[in-house]
Amino acid sequence: MKALVKTRPEPGLELVEVPDPVAGPNDVIVKVMRTGICGTDVHIDKWDGWAAKTVHTPLVLGHEFCGEIVELGSEVNDLEVGQFVSGEGHYVCGRCRACLAGKRHLCRNTQGIGYAVNGAYCQYFVMPAGNVWVHHIPDLDPDVAAIFDPFGNAVHTALQFPCLAEDVLVSGAGPIGIMAALVAQFQGARNVVVTDLSDERLELAQQLGLKNAVNVSREGLETVWDRFDMKEGFDIGLEMSGSGTALTSMIDNMTHGGRIALLGTPSTDITLDFSKIIFNMITIQGVTGRQIFETWYTMASLIRSGLDISGIITDRYPITEFREAFDVAGSGHGGKVVMNWECLD
């Protein structure tokens, strides 16, 4: 079969032949239909400092995917060949304190597909049956099914705190930031304000229904307070950018008792004024991945209830044009990029 592989510790990827997978007793094999490109995949493609420290080559990339089950392991009896699925990309140990308490998203021994172990950028992907998510939404677009992983990051972050009737600030209008803002708005937030430095990404946010998109290189958040008759600041902050400047500004603009969820990962050290956090009694909650599988149930319910995230996918390519797809994904413009594997059939 074909797979998209980081063959050597240097920039670039190759679409090459690799052995077909073999299912263990508790595994399934999925015929991959679509895959999304994550920022992690871009880092590995470019072979930056993080990738050089983290990834061992050769490695099959990819953790955003959907496809059809084509084979079941001998001990798998609760899934069926032909089911349309995605998968939870975090493999957990099942034996640590968190796993035994049912908090698998907190497993200290987590391994991520596509960077710690081989991933889903391949025609046929084998994974544990316990990581498979079956899509039961009628007529779900495979492109949307392929991005349930990052959608889950957005949902997990946006729903850290109840946002009904609250004023919500989202810093970072990348795909996950926009999806988080859409979730907050869909859940009944009073005002949702999205900030970024990119007019292109803010325009995409507006096209998807987030009318309060602010370029903070030209407009300060204090003008937003006036626009929405805000007297005390934002109730909830969702920091999606990894920018120290954005986090500092968010803290400055929170109401007393405000709550911040952090998903964006800083690339450098950040200096914070802890006196503001302490005396304003601000709660800061770190977030990674998804709750397994509670977030997946929530995602499916949101889609069934009418939340439309399809517009976040702005570019689609056959896998044979992966180089163009990765160049677009790495440009920092636009939304999600999805690659189609069915062209290899």
UniProtKB/Swiss-Prot annotation:
Cofactor list: Zn(2+)
Catalytic residues as annotated in Swiss-Prot or TrEMBL: 40, 43
Residues reported in the UniProt entry to bind NAD(+): 176, 196, 201, 263-265, 287-288
Catalytic activity of the protein: L-threonine + NAD(+) = (2S)-2-amino-3-oxobutanoate + NADH + H(+)
Residues of the site described as Important for catalytic activity for the proton relay mechanism but does not participate directly in the coordination of zinc atom: 149
PANTHER family: L-THREONINE 3-DEHYDROGENASE
UniProt-recorded name of the protein: L-threonine 3-dehydrogenase
Record organism: Cutibacterium acnes (strain DSM 16379 / KPA171202) (Propionibacterium acnes)
